[in-house]
């Protein structure tokens, strides 16, 4: 049964602080916790806040482990738009997390299925994800789990929809440079996280956000599977939350 805690914020900085509070609580309780991390512009205020908190002595990442949601297929780790490089530049290079304790899917792996299985084993060996950061696509995708006729369970390769490629072309010189495939955690891997924190901004996300949490659960809206998670905190700005229940309201469905 979904237990949804809604926190509404006015600015990206407020969102970063609210999300950092969730991560800080987990890290302080379990110093060797496993974070599930995401990329994109929305998590940046969170990452800046986490860096600031460690610099202020409030957090210690030296024992923390992290597993990223996804990576583009075909991009080297040092490619300007690879998610490995994004994480290095925006978080890992600025905190005390050990390089061997950060994993991102290998978009250049010769054997993608074997790499995906190894990725799952690593997360399992670590004891599973304690806190998973998520966003949501305009079509309801989480990670790169695109709308389809089933819920992919484990980490896997996926062909990206034109909607997703169009949404991500702002990070590239042209749509032709946007990869056509990616590697992503499956919804089963995401759902296995003990806690999920979702960060959402923009009026253009209001409809899909409501559909994810209050529409029918179906693989055509991959994020709707979150209705079966027992601990979800949604942090969103007021326009994204236009159709959602009131701030601070805890919804059980």
Positions of PLM-derived features:
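N-terminal glycine-/serine-/threonine-rich phosphate-binding loop
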Residues: 1-35
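Short beta-strand segments
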Residues: 36-40, 68, 105-106, 133-136, ...
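ATP/nucleoside-binding phosphotransfer catalytic cores, i.e., glycine-rich phosphate-binding loops
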Residues: 188, 192-253
